[in-house]
Amino acid sequence: MMMNSHFAGVGDNVDKEAYGHGIQVVDEDKVFNNNLSTYLNIEKVIPAGFNYHLISVFGSQSTGKSTLLNYLFGTQFGVMAEQERRQTTKGIWMSKNKRPEGGSAMAENILVMDVEGTDGRERGEDQDFERKSALFALATSEVLIVNIWEHQVGLYQGANMGLLKTVFEVNLQLFIKDSKTIPKSLLFFVIRDHLGTTPLKNLQNTLTQDLSKLWSTISKPKGLENSRIEEYFDFAFVALPHKILQPEKFEEAVTKLSLRFKEGYNDPKTSGLVDEAELPIFQPQYHRRIPADGFPAYAEGIWDQIVHNKDLDLPTQQELLAQFRCDEISREVLVLFDETIAPLEEKQAEDTRMGKPSVIAELGAAMNAARSTVFKDFETNASRYHKGVYKRKQAELEGKVDTRLKALSQKQLNAAHKSGVESFSDAVSAAVKAGQKKGASYDFAQIVDSEKKKAIAQFGEQAKSIVIEGASWSSFEHELKVYRKDLDDVSGRLRKDEMRRLATRIERWVRSRLDESVGLEFNKLGTGRGGSGAPEHGERPPSEKDLWDRVWAIFTETVSSAEKRFTDRAQSFDASPEEVDVGLWRLRRKSWGVLRAKIDEEVMEGNILLKLRENFEDKFRYDEQGVPRIWRPTDDIEGIYTKARESTITVIPLLARFKLSKTSAPPPLDAWIGDAPASVTPADEEDLTPIGGLDEEEGKSLEEEMTVLSDAKQADLLIRFKKTADGVYVEAKRSAIGGITQVPLYFYGLLVALGWNEIVAVLRNPVYFIFLILCAVGAYVTYTLNLWGPMIRMGNAASAQALEVGKERLREFLESSESGRQAMAMSGNQPRGESVRMNRLNGNGKKDEDAEVEDLDDI
């Protein structure tokens, strides 16, 4: 056990060092310490005015109150050793917040009072001091921390409800004059060793209900008979993990909790919108508005009034005995109850941790037997004591037992619910897959209806098996309604998934049809036209003029056929008209996206240039009868080229806008797709591509949606096409000129006549002749093996190396002679002109291009 060292006790004549950890405000003999003002001066609280806060802790002995304060505020209150179970804190102790890491996150000048625990064996039945100390803490503190264990929630004495009742009663009599003077405090319940089995919200509700009932039973002064506990107290709740079993989580939770001890304001406008676990603790209405320099006298006056008041008498011995025995009997019967129920709770908890809640067989029989046994045993042994206490304890026991059984039942129903929904979903999916594998049409609605009946029947059997006899709360009608609703939701989701898959299959069919049909229409550009016979002005052939009309007609016919397929198949899913409307609306939007993607593919730079070139060559390379032209110098190549080029150029504006030839306007896409059905959800729209003219929030008009080629792209396409056409023109021009620039035949005869002597000399000389044959054979072999390139590169490399070696030898020769060094020095000092080193000259004696590039890099 760690005692309170460096604390100033009552009546001690101590120096400043003795106040290092705090002061004893009231000793175990109810004597108030007159040195409280000295301690507050040392801690520099006296000059703070109203800028201070007072917190007290309240709870049973040996429940870790001092330990909690030490962790929260860095204090050094005495705590109990693990090996002993005896009283540590005697009287009331005070210390200032010492937490260094709190920093600016915590409020300034937090004073903490550690109050002697209740229900201690050292005082036994003498509960006078614990009531007076609790009343003192309640009357002086802004925040009263009620430290209780999780298993004490719902108890009367364990949760100190009896003591709180007396404290509330006397507090009203002593300190509340009328309804206009209502000082408010915060009762901050810290629930220790919270395992998470019972949610904090449930524990909070239990404590709140107990306090409300407690308040309704106390006697109130005249004029306050109808007052409510909420008028005098606010409540806050927090749960902390087990300190021994979960030390890291405990310290983490305490650190987080300590940061809440700061000043704040509870804005009614944000009530319910802010997480209660992060709200500041200190509110303006809690402060007693006593200046710090007057607090010692105020506290001493409060204590004097409490000590000399006679209303704090103990309950009768009969009631105390009844409370003790009923609590003891309750604990005994709960031990047997735990032997049956605890393993079931552990199994459910383990299944929950594994993420696989399972239905426990024979759970209902075990719960009914355990409940009947525990109530019968308690009645047999406890009904002999005080009837009022017995009835109250019986109700408390029933609440504890039913709370645990209700949790078991609820988890069992949840497990049956979850497994039933999963089985239903799996069964429907398996039946659908089986129908798809057979290749035959299947009735989705019939499959869903059959599997739903099986799932509901199974859930009903499992729910009936866990009904608790005599328990008003044991009913599963609500759960069955929720289960039916979830099955309907799953059915709707499966139907939507099936319709999505249907829509995907139909979209693929639409894409394949449009890819083929629209591609053929674009391939018709330029076909069926004679070359120079094509009109430069006037009506265009159908392949160009009606291109967009044909594309739109193909598109609408294809989608209409797809809509019919979709509607016929959706009827077998038992889909509602709203779902069908949404599916058709999505299909039209998706189909337009497919068409637009196909158009963009056709007018991609490479594809459109190829089509324009084919269009141009069809007019330029072929005559009126479609016969390829053989260009002659006498042909009017320039005229034919100009007509063909200008005619092809006019195709670009035609492709730039999706317009119908009859109306010279874009097709009525917005009317064709239609408005979104009223039943469309955000999930239905999240994968849809925005369409101009329909989705106005995208800022894109219908005209922009129908723009296939922008002005900039048209200009770029025009330039590229002209370059391509110019290349074809130059090629044609060369072929025409090439026919008259052949070598004359007489030149070959003249070459043979003039070189006849040399030919005869080589043929008559065996050496020359053999050498010529060997050279020819070597050249052929080299050509066959593709070695000309490597040989040329090797020759170039060898010559370059020889040149470098020659330069180096020349440099060494010049450096070895006096005249050479002078010449080199003079050459290096030339102020003007370009210096060209020898190793930077190419084979022609000129500066190497690579050297010029390196010089530019140096600059």
Curated annotation (Swiss-Prot):
Residues 476-496 form a coiled coil. Residues 764-766 are lumenal. SUPFAM superfamilies: P-loop containing nucleoside triphosphate hydrolases. It is a multi-pass membrane protein. HAMAP family: Sey1 (MF_03109). Residues 49-291 form the GB1/RHD3-type G domain. Belongs to the TRAFAC class dynamin-like GTPase superfamily. GB1/RHD3 GTPase family. RHD3 subfamily. The chain crosses the membrane at residues 743-763, 767-787. Its EC number is 3.6.5.-. It is found in: Endoplasmic reticulum membrane. One of its GO terms (cellular component) is endoplasmic reticulum membrane. One of its GO terms (biological process) is endoplasmic reticulum membrane fusion. GO terms for molecular function: GTP binding; GTPase activity. GTP binds at G59, S60, Q61, S62, T63, G64, K65, S66. Gene3D superfamilies: P-loop containing nucleotide triphosphate hydrolases (3.40.50.300). The keyword Manganese does not apply. Residues 850-859 have a biased composition (Acidic residues). Pfam families: RHD3_GTPase, Sey1_3HB. Keywords: Coiled coil, Endoplasmic reticulum, GTP-binding, Hydrolase, Membrane, Nucleotide-binding, Transmembrane, Transmembrane helix. Residues 525-544, 816-859 are annotated as: Disordered. The gene is SEY1. This is Protein SEY1. Its main location: endoplasmic reticulum. Residues 1-742, 788-859 are cytoplasmic.
